[in-house]
């Protein structure tokens, strides 16, 4: 359990280092896991370098199904520290190991709240970073800018989702080398600006860069969907750390559209099969290719344009529900009173008056209620294309 002083340091500075928190035997076990699972997940960029040529390589996706990698997900110090700092039960949103090979280039200044990424669009998450070697001058320090997270930028707005004011980029002089060493645990706020130097050593610079979100703050794009095999590699208690998992693929996406009248109303399309939420089969958006597939906002918005003739400025994740042989990723949007008063291709029904027997999937009411549930605190998800022009778009 973290002390009050440690929690205050994290809140004020945006990071906290627990020296030597990860046992040497655990690091060695992780190294064996990496040896058995080459870091080839990458960015899906066809022009990316070929491992192990100079570059930065990613081990992610479903790699945690290997017990020699997955065990660290439920490491007591990591999980308890995340719980203390998030003030909520933590759930894993990303399992990532980076391998920067000799002469691999560094990363420029950035922070990692990103509204298009399953691993970056929760409104309350943190990094748990564990170096497998000393991040020194030769292998490449990870620099942080203390206090640059500026959480006062996050505030309530006129919608059910939180608003975020534009980030303030720190000056070069504000970055420090925190002196990370093998086996340390760096806990880092999602908004903290950081950068990494190139690897000028003759050995690989490897580290664990997992992300945990507060359970009540789902990613705006939806979670990266872990396979059941990942969950089965964990203990019964550890399985609580995986928010969503399945042996099915996400195949469709739909939108819950609500508005407030005398009571909450929900929009449905009237089809031959019954009442259905607008949406359809997914298409993978490849505007910003990366490993954490799961953002189907572009597909959902396309269906809303075609079926409802509306362009929503954002959508936010509700849940994944069975549809056919796959899963349906469902997003939500709440109308305000400023829309132009035209009719829609479909029907608005008071929530209490929806005829359940006419619903196509039977889970629609559950999805609406989850969207309206105030215990979930959401952000505004964007498509990849919307974020190409400004990766820190708010």
Regions found by a protein language model. Give the residues of each.
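Non-heme Fe(II)/2-oxoglutarate
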Residues: 40, 44-45, 192-248
């Amino acid at each position: 359990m973290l002390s009050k002083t440690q929690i205050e340091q994290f809140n004020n500075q945006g990071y906290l280092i627990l020296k030597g928190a990860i046992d040497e035997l655990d690091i060695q076990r992780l190294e064996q896991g990496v040896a058995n699972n080459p870091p080839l997940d990458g960015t899906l960029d066809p022009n990316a370098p070929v491992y192990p040529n100079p570059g930065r390589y990613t081990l992610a996706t479903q790699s945690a199904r290997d017990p020699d990698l997955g065990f660290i997900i439920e490491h007591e110090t990591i999980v308890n520290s995340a719980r203390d700092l998030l003030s909520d039960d933590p759930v894993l949103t990303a399992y990532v190991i980076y391998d920067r090979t000799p002469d691999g280039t560094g990363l420029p200044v950035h922070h990692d709240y990103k509204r298009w990424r399953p691993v970056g669009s929760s409104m309350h998450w943190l990094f748990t970073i564990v170096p497998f070697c000393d991040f020194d001058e030769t292998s490449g320090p990870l620099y942080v800018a203390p206090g640059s997270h500026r959480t006062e930028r996050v505030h309530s707005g006129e919608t059910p989702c939180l608003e975020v004011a534009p980030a303030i980029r720190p000056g070069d002089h504000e970055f420090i080398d925190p002196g990370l060493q093998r086996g340390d645990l760096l806990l880092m706020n999602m908004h903290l600006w950081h950068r990494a130097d190139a690897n000028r050593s003759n050995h690989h610079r490897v580290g664990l860069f997992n992300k945990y979100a507060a359970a009540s703050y789902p990613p705006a794009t939806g979670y990266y969907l872990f396979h059941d095999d990942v969950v089965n590699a964990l203990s019964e208690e550890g399985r609580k750390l995986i928010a969503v998992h399945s042996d099915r693929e996400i195949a469709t996406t739909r939108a819950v559209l609500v508005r407030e009248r005398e009571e909450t109303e929900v929009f449905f399309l009237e089809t031959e099969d019954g009442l259905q939420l607008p949406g359809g089969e997914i298409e993978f958006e490849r505007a910003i290719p990366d490993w954490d597939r799961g953002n189907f906002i572009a597909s959902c918005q396309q269906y809303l344009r075609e079926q409802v003739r509306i362009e929503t400025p954002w959508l936010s994740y509700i849940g994944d529900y069975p549809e056919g042989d796959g899963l349906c990723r469902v997003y939500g949007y709440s109308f305000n009173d400023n829309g132009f008063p035209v009719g829609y291709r479909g029907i608005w029904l008071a929530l209490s008056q929806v005829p359940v027997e006419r619903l196509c999937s039977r889970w629609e009411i559950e999805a609406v209620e989850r969207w309206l549930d105030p215990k979930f605190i959401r952000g505004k998800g964007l498509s990849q294309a919307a974020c190409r022009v400004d990766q820190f778009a708010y």
